[in-house]
From Swiss-Prot:
<keyword id="KW-0138">CF(0)</keyword>
<dbReference type="GO" id="GO:0005886">
    <property type="term" value="C:plasma membrane"/>
</dbReference>
<dbReference type="GO" id="GO:0045259">
    <property type="term" value="C:proton-transporting ATP synthase complex"/>
</dbReference>
<comment type="function">
    <text>F(1)F(0) ATP synthase produces ATP from ADP in the presence of a proton or sodium gradient. F-type ATPases consist of two structural domains, F(1) containing the extramembraneous catalytic core and F(0) containing the membrane proton channel, linked together by a central stalk and a peripheral stalk. During catalysis, ATP synthesis in the catalytic domain of F(1) is coupled via a rotary mechanism of the central stalk subunits to proton translocation.</text>
</comment>
<keyword id="KW-1133">Transmembrane helix</keyword>
<keyword id="KW-1003">Cell membrane</keyword>
<comment type="similarity">
    <text>Belongs to the ATPase B chain family.</text>
</comment>
<keyword id="KW-0375">Hydrogen ion transport</keyword>
<dbReference type="GO" id="GO:0046933">
    <property type="term" value="F:proton-transporting ATP synthase activity, rotational mechanism"/>
</dbReference>
<dbReference type="InterPro" id="IPR002146">
    <property type="entry name" value="ATP_synth_b/b'su_bac/chlpt"/>
</dbReference>
<comment type="subunit">
    <text>F-type ATPases have 2 components, F(1) - the catalytic core - and F(0) - the membrane proton channel. F(1) has five subunits: alpha(3), beta(3), gamma(1), delta(1), epsilon(1). F(0) has three main subunits: a(1), b(2) and c(10-14). The alpha and beta chains form an alternating ring which encloses part of the gamma chain. F(1) is attached to F(0) by a central stalk formed by the gamma and epsilon chains, while a peripheral stalk is formed by the delta and b chains.</text>
</comment>
<keyword id="KW-0997">Cell inner membrane</keyword>
<keyword id="KW-0812">Transmembrane</keyword>
<keyword id="KW-0472">Membrane</keyword>
<dbReference type="GO" id="GO:0046961">
    <property type="term" value="F:proton-transporting ATPase activity, rotational mechanism"/>
</dbReference>
<dbReference type="InterPro" id="IPR050059">
    <property type="entry name" value="ATP_synthase_B_chain"/>
</dbReference>
<keyword id="KW-0066">ATP synthesis</keyword>
Length: 201
């Protein structure tokens, strides 16, 4: 039967079995790992070159990815936005031009309508004035004719009345003379006496 070895007293085959006498200058005490005795690895000088190389590679890869993937997408987005803005500006300019043209056409139509209205009003005033003048002249001519006819009638009636008055006066004078003298006067003497009498107006 094989003898059992105590692991606490029997060294491991991989263990260093060199015995160092007490007080030897090679004697040292192991420090537990995890202490602050070593430097931070990124700050160790012998790793600077490799770190710079990896940093350059990382930046190069990042630049490549940005230039091939991200930047084209950003440029495409910016290009689409620029094209949309340009299209919107062009459309706005076109609409502004159309609005200006419509405003100018409206103002022109308004001016033409005002001119036509003024011309029609002036023509109407002229027509009414000419018609009024014609009516006034016609009325004046009619009134003048009536006035002339009235004056002629008055003169005729005055002449007739005066003739009647002369006849009445002659008859009256003849009756008076006959009453006073007992003899009727002759017609020639009576006419001379009537002619010598002033006419009463």
């Amino acid at each position: 039967m094989a003898e059992q070895k105590n692991p606490l007293t029997t060294p491991s085959p991989n263990a260093d079995t060199t015995i160092v006498p007490a007080g030897s200058p090679h004697t040292h005490t192991e420090q537990p790992s995890g202490g602050h005795g070593g430097a931070f690895p990124p700050f160790e000088s012998h790793t600077f070159l490799s770190q710079l190389i990896w940093l350059a590679l990382a930046f190069g890869l990042l630049y490549y990815l940005m230039s091939k993937v991200a930047l084209p997408r950003i440029e495409a987005i910016l290009g689409n936005r620029a094209g949309r803005l340009s299209s919107d500006l062009t459309e706005a300019q076109r609409m502004k031009t159309e609005a200006d043209a419509a405003g100018a056409a409206y103002e022109k139509s308004l001016r033409e309508a005002q001119a036509k209205a003024q011309a029609i009003a002036q023509e109407t005033r002229n027509s009414l004035s000419a018609e009024a003048d014609a009516k006034r002249k016609t009325l004046e001519a009619e009134l003048n004719q009536r006035l002339a006819a009235s004056e002629a009638t008055i003169r005729t009636r005055t002449t007739e009345a005066m003739g009647n008055v002369r006849a009445i006066a002659g008859e009256t004078a003849s009756a008076i003379v006959e009453r006073l003298t007992g003899q009727a006067p002759d017609q020639a003497s009576l006419n001379r006496a009537l002619d010598a009498t002033p006419a009463v107006h």
